[in-house]
Amino acid sequence: MLEQAEKLMKRNSSGAMSAPQSKPLARSRSSTMPTTTQKRVRSSQQSEGEPEYNIKVYVRCRSRNEREIREKSSVVISTLGNNGREVILTNPGTGSNKTYTFDRVFGVESDQESMFNQVARAYINEMIEGYNCTVFAYGQTGTGKTYTMSGDITMMGSSEDDPNFVLLSEHAGIIPRVLVELFRELREVSEDYSVKVSFLELYNEKLRDLLVDDKDVSLEDHNFNGMAPPESIRIYDSLKTDRTSPNGYSIFVKGMEEMYIRSAQEGLKLLMDGSLKRKVAATKCNDLSSRSHTIFTITTNVTKIHPISGEQYVKVGKLNLVDLAGSENINRSGAENKRAQEAGLINKSLLTLGRVINALVDHSQHIPYRESKLTRLLQDSLGGKTKTCIIATISPAKISMEETVSTLEYATRAKSIKNTPQVNQLMAKESCIIEYIQEIERLRKELRASHSKEGIYITQEKFETYESNSILVEEQQAKIDNLQEQLRRLKEKFLEQTKLIKEKDGQIKELDVANRKYLEQSKDLTIYINGIHSKLEDYEHTMIGIHNNNMKLLEDINDNRGNIHEDLLAKVDHIETCNLIISREITSLISIRNVLQAYSDRFKTVLGGVFEELQEKLTQVGRTTEESQLDVDLSFVDEKFEEVTDIIKATCENLVRTMDEHVSNMKLETTDLTSSCASLLEKECQALHGKLQKYVESMKQELNSTLQEMVRDLDMKASSMLNVVQCTKDGLISHKKELEADLESQKREHFDIAQTMEEQLQKIVGKERQNIQESMKASYDFLMKQMVETELRQKNFEESIVSKVKGLLSHSNNGMSKMSSYAVGRLYDSAIGGVNSIENTVSSATFSMKNDLQEFQMDISPICDSRRFGDEFTAVETRISEAIREELTPKLQDITSKACNLIGLGVQDINQKALGVSDDQRRELRSVINNTNNHADRLRSEIGTLVNYVSQEHRDNIMQISQTQDEILQEQIASIGRTFDVLGNINKPDANVRTSVPIEHELNSAINELPPLYMPQRPLSLCSHGRQLLDEAYSGNENLSPSTGKFSNFPTPCGDMSAQTPTTPMPVPDQPLTKMPVPQTISSLRSLRRLTMDICEHSADMTLGSIHESQKAMDSSRRYTLEPRLFEK
C-alpha cells in the first residue's frame, strides 16, 4: 500500500499513471473511509429535467423438474419463443387464458448466455460511464434465481499470461459473466482503472459480510467479554459528498469489506468463497434452496481526461447484482422449526418489497423502505437514480400456479415504476489521491500500533461501546457497593432477628415440651378412643345382628302363629262338623226313637185292637163252637201271642239296644275326637310355650350380654367422652396458640404503635424544637432590631449627649427592660406551650393506646370465658343419653349419670385450664400494657427533662444576658463619668484643650446651645460597681448637683479657644464590629461546630443556644459602642 501511495504521488507529479496490473490486491472497510470535500469537475446531466425510464422487467420460465414430472403436473405457462414478450397463463379449471406482457420473455429454450446478452451486458457499459445499475432476480423457491444470477462459478480454463482470460462453463450465470466481460471492456476503454467488489448476505434480517473470514468475526465478538456484540454492519444514509451517488445522497453500508481485484479470476474466487458461506438448506421444492438474500456489488473507478481542459477525472460506477431468496408456501415446502422461521422472515421482506412496489406504482406519499433491510438496500434501485431491471423466474407446472400468478402480478406492477438515472459525480484525481494517502496513514498507524503492541485500532463506535461498558461497570460497581452496604445492614438486622429468634426458640422449646406431654396424653387417649370406637363398631354390628335375629324370630313366630291358628281353625271346623253330624245322628236317633215309640204305641194299640177283635171273634167263635175247641185255640193263641209278644219285645229290645250302642258309640267318638283335639292343642301350646321359654331365656341371655356390652360401651363412651375432652383440650391448645399468635400480633402492633408514637413524639419534639428555635430566633431578631434601634438612639445620644442624657438613659432603661421582659416572656410562653402540646399529644396517644388495649381485653375475655366447649359436650351428652334411653332399659340411667358426672368433671377441668390459659394471656397483656405505660412514663419523664432543660437554658441565657447588659451599662456609666470629667476640666478656668480642627465659634456659645442635663427622677437599679462609678462621676464634677438632679451651665472658658475644638467625649470603635460566636443548638449539642454572624445582620442561622455560649466570650470577642443597655430587676 505504501508503494501504491508513492506511485500515485509520482503519477500526480508527472501527469501519467501506470497500468492497472501494477496495483496489489487491497481491501478497505467503508466504515474507515474518511469523508473529505471532493472536487466536483462536472456532471454530465443535471438533476432537473432528467428523463424518467420504467424499470425493465424480464421473465424466465424454466422447464418442469423431476418432482413436477413425477407428480404429473400439467403445464399452465406458454411463451412465444426466443424473442417473445408475452406470457400466456392457462387456467385449467375454466379453460381461460390470461396474457402478461414484459420487456422480454425467456422460455425453456433460452440459455445462460442469451440471458446475459439480453439483460446484463448493456449495464456493464452503463456502469463504466458512471451510472449506478441494479439487476435482481425475484420469484418462487426452486424457479432458478440463483442459477440465473450465479450458475456454475467454476472456471473451465485460464491463461497465466493474460489473467483476464477466463473460460466459463455454459451454465455460468450473470455475475461471473459480468466479471469477465467487465475487465475486457475496461481494457478497451482505459488503462487506468480500479475495480472493487463487496458481497453482502441478508439472513433473518441481519447483515453479514461474506468476504470476511469467520475467524475475524469471532475474534471481534470475543472482545466483548461475553456481552452481546453490536451489529458490525449497519445501514446509514450516506453523506452528501458521496461520489457514488448523482446527487450526493444514497444508502451507505457501514462496516462492509470492499476488496480490490485486478482480474476476473480474483473476482470469481471471491464470489466462490462468499457463495460457499451463504445459508442454504434442502426443502421439498428444491434440494439446495437459498435461505438468504445476497447482494454482489461491483464498483469501478475509471480515469479519463477532459477533452477541453485536459484535466484528469474519475468516473465512478456501481453495479448491484441481487439474488433474492425465494418466496415459498411453508406447508408445501415442508419447512419446520428453524426453516419455518427463515421462510417467515423471507416472506416478510418480500412482502415489504411488494408493498414498496405497490406504493411506487400508486405514487403514494410514503414509501415503506425502512420496514425491511432488503427494501432499505434497494431503496435507490426502486424509484431512485439507478438503472434497474428485474428478472422474474417462474415455474410452468400447475402445482405452482398460485406462486406463478403472484410473481407475474408483482412483475407487471413493477413495470410501472419509473426511475431517473443520473451519472454519478465526477471526482478529481487529486482528491482521490488525498483520500488514498489518508487511508495509507491510517493503515500505518494501525500497523505501528500492532508492531509496538501499544494497543489495537478500534473504531469510534467500538470505543464509545467500550466507554459505555466501562461506565456500566462503574455503575454496577456502585450498585454492588450499595448492595454490600445493604447486605451489611441486613446482616446486622439478621443478627438482631437471630437473637430474637433464639429467645423465641427457647419459648418455643418450652412450649414444645408441654406440647409433647399433651401429645403423649393425646396419643394414649387416641389409642383408647380408637379401641372404644372399634368396640362401639362391634357393638353396633352385634346389635344389628341381634336386631336382625329378633326380626327374623318375630317373623317366624308370626308365620308359626298364623299356621297354628289356621290349623286350630281347621280342627275347630272339623269338630263343629262332627258335632253337627253327631247332633244330626242324635236327632235322627231321637226321631227313630220317637218313631219306634210311636210304632210301639201303635203296635200296642193295634195289638190291643187285635186282641180286642180276637177277643170279640173268640167270644163269637166260642159262642158258636164248642167249648172244647175254643180252649184248644185259646191256648194255642196264647202261646202264639206270647211268642209274638216275645219276638216283638226282643225286636224292640234289639232296636233299643242298637240305638243305645250307636248313641254310645257316637258319644265315644265325640269324646275321643274332643280329647284328641284337646291333646293336640295342648301339645301345640306346650311346644309353643317351650319355644317361647327358650326365646325368653335367649332374650334374657342376650339382654344380659347386651347389658354387659352396654356397660362396656358406656365405659368406652366415657373414654370417648374423655377423647372428646382431649380433642377439646387440643382445640383449647390450638386456641391458645391462636391467642398467643394474636397476642404476638397485638404485641407487634403495639410495638409498631409505640414506634409510631416514638416517631410522632420525635417529630413533635422536633417540631417543638423548631418552633422554639424559630421563636428564639424571632426573639433574637427582635432583640437585634432593638439593638440596632439602640445604636441609632446612641447616635442621637451622641448628637444630644449634653441636653438629653437623662431622658435617653431613662428611655433606654425602660425600653430595654420591657423588651427583655417581653422577649423572655414570649420565649417562656412558647416553650411552655410547646411542652404542654407535647404532653397533651403524649397523654392522648397513651390514652388511645390504653383504650386499644382495653378493647383488646374486652375482645379476648368473651373468647376466654366462653362455655362453647361445655355446650358441645352437653349436646354430645344429651345425644348419648337419648340413644341410651331409646336402646336400653332404665337400669342404665345410673351408669349414664355417672358418665355424665365424669364428663362434667372433665369439662370443668378443661374450662378451668382454659380459664388459666386466658388468665395467663391476660397477665401477659397486662404486662404489655404495663410496659407500654412505663414506656409512656419514660417518654413523659424525658419530655419533662427536655422542658426543664429548655426552661433552665432560658433562665441561664436570660441571666447571662442580664449580666452582660449590666456590664455594658457599667461601661456606659463609666464612659458618662469620663465625659463628665472632660466637661468639668473644660469648665475649669485654666483649661487648655487642644483640638485638631479649629472652631470658628466660641466655646461658650457652643456650650450655651447644649440643653441642661438633669438627674434621673427614678434611681437606676445598678450593681455596686456601677453606683461607685456614678458617685465618682458626681464627685469629680462640681457643677453636677445630685440633690437637685440638674446640671448647671458651664462658665465662659478662659483664653482664646477659637483655634481649638473639643475632642468628642464618646469612644468610637476604630475597627468594624467583630462577629459574635453562635453556640450549638439544642438539637446538635454533640457537634463542635460554631456558627458566627455579624451583629448588625439578621442571620437565619441564629438559634436558641446561640446566646447561651456567646455570653462568656462577649467582652473579648466583641467591640461595642457605648450603648445604653440597662437591665431592670
Curated annotation (Swiss-Prot):
InterPro entries: KIF11-like, KIF11-like_kin_motor_dom, Kinesin_motor_CS, Kinesin_motor_dom, Kinesin_motor_dom_sf, P-loop_NTPase. One of its GO terms (cellular component) is mitotic spindle. Keywords: ATP-binding, Cell cycle, Cell division, Coiled coil, Cytoplasm, Cytoskeleton, Microtubule, Mitosis, Motor protein, Nucleotide-binding. Residues 11-21, 28-48 have a biased composition (Polar residues). Gene3D superfamilies: Apolipoprotein, Kinesin motor domain. Its main location: cytoplasm. It is found in: Cytoplasm, Cytoskeleton, Spindle. ATP binds at residues 139-146. GO terms for biological process: 2-micrometer plasmid partitioning; cell division; initial mitotic spindle pole body separation; microtubule depolymerization; microtubule-based movement; mitotic spindle assembly; spindle elongation. Residues 422-513, 681-765, 919-948 form a coiled coil. Residues 54-417 form the Kinesin motor domain. PROSITE patterns: KINESIN_MOTOR_1, KINESIN_MOTOR_2. One of its GO terms (molecular function) is microtubule binding. Pfam families: Kinesin (PF00225). Residues 1-49 are annotated as: Disordered. Belongs to the TRAFAC class myosin-kinesin ATPase superfamily. Kinesin family. BimC subfamily. Required for assembly of the mitotic spindle. Interacts with spindle microtubules to produce an outwardly directed force acting upon the poles. Following spindle assembly, CIN8 and KIP1 apparently act to oppose a force that draws separated poles back together. This force seems to be mediate by KAR3. This is Kinesin-like protein KIP1.
